[in-house]
């Protein structure tokens, strides 16, 4: 049965970014923790300690790693500091004054941070015994911190400045709330999240794995996991075919020059794997190959292979293309953050007069995908550029045109949306779908982008009705986003209980005795003939264990087969969702399974 987290509408858990007071509380808590650590561990050097969406952390350089016992002692010391009701005082100083004070404390990391700051330099004091180089904001006194509404959660390794070549630090994570009730609810949700963790369930259900000889962030898919992937791919391919998409296949790598034209090499290089070159000279001239971080330049080459007529447009090219991003090892997380992943990528080449209708059609496709997957809680983010940043390519006019097109489409659809400044891709704005899961965590899934820049950079053209050469507009879209991330989210959303149409194993036949094995195989052959994914449990275990094993494997449908069923050519059907369905003939079961799977019903 698909499980949902219990309703907790009475207790709200706002994000830090949604609450100015939580931002102050959590930021100050990181300082309180650093003060406690340096009192208990005088050799610990401080680095940075920001707030996060659910709490805070602080990175320390220490001779020895922190233990669980250390965390308990640190928390106890933090309670003492809070109960002293210390004033939190902001002080402005000159660079020279800040440098002198930091050098006197012997804090090299703070000295490095200071070098990147402009005056005035601000310090925050906890009473008169501890201070930190910080821009704030903070509470006015530790009396605003509730000693019963925080906890220290874990210790992890981290690199200074996120650079693997620099010092390894100890990061202590904590959480802090305004009330003890919020802390209790947060812990409940976290415990539920651990039960649903896709890394845990993926291992238990035998869907995917990671292997050290292969490397971090590179998942290996088992036969069951591959069925899950293929089912999702086939579903989307069928939906795309109905809408006039054409499938293409492109290589996993290309010459650096391709990505120089697209702008990826200049604007996205830090996220790409290093260049592969034949020798040092070629490397110096940047004449090598790189693994692709995106599929769009390849699809552009297919479009550009021949001169297009206005009558051919829109051209919709689609590919499940594997791309590669050089994520830092500390940023990797199961399937939701990997180094090699498959994007359900498509690029539409349209005339300007087709842009609005094609954009709306893409959104309709994404919404239909969400409906089939029973993903109901999501919101739309219009991801626009930050006009103060220089990381984007293209003119202001082009950006304004693209952003206006996306906003107009969202308003035409009557969508509730919010604008995310600075969330755009470097080449164009996006409409991103942010999904909220059963535990109120947010994930970006589908995305649609309007792009006037890459057609310009690659000099794309089509012959207009009057014979002139015109520039097409590109739409980038991916309903799933990343197939790996989607599967990770679905595992957690369904708690491993996949709907019938998506389950890697849809029905398991449970023979009570060996004498009915031949009949079981006959039934299995009939079900496979209509495309049902079926297995026969030939372990010889007793019926109770057969059922428990099927339940543990979260098989949607079980068919118990004994001598009576074999003689009458029937099956005794049980489902995880509705329990005992009684006796069915093979023909009845076949009909019901076919109908439920075709209609993508959650269960039989």
Curated annotation (Swiss-Prot):
Region called Catalytic, residue ranges: 197-499
Would you say which domain of life the source belongs to? Bacteria
* EC number(s) on file: 6.1.1.3
Keyword Aminoacyl-tRNA synthetase assigned to the entry: answer is yes
Record InterPro entries: aa-tRNA-synt_IIb (IPR002314), aa-tRNA-synth_II (IPR006195), aa-tRNA-synth_II/BPL/LPL (IPR045864), Anticodon-bd (IPR004154), Anticodon-bd_dom_sf (IPR036621), Thr-tRNA-ligase_IIa (IPR002320), Thr/Ala-tRNA-synth_IIc_edit (IPR018163), ThrRS_anticodon (IPR047246)
Q: Kindly indicate whether the keyword Cytoplasm belongs to this entry.
A: yes
What are the UniProt keywords, alphabetically?
Answer: Aminoacyl-tRNA synthetase, ATP-binding, Cytoplasm, Ligase, Metal-binding, Nucleotide-binding, Protein biosynthesis, RNA-binding, tRNA-binding, Zinc
Q: Which family does it belong to?
A: Belongs to the class-II aminoacyl-tRNA synthetase family.
**Which PANTHER family does the record cross-reference, listed alphabetically?**
THREONINE--TRNA LIGASE, CHLOROPLASTIC_MITOCHONDRIAL 2 (PTHR11451:SF44), THREONINE-TRNA LIGASE (PTHR11451)
Described purpose of this protein according to its UniProt entry: Catalyzes the attachment of threonine to tRNA(Thr) in a two-step reaction: L-threonine is first activated by ATP to form Thr-AMP and then transferred to the acceptor end of tRNA(Thr). Also edits incorrectly charged L-seryl-tRNA(Thr).
UniProt name for this protein: Threonine--tRNA ligase
Q: Which organism is it from?
A: Synechococcus elongatus (strain ATCC 33912 / PCC 7942 / FACHB-805) (Anacystis nidulans R2)
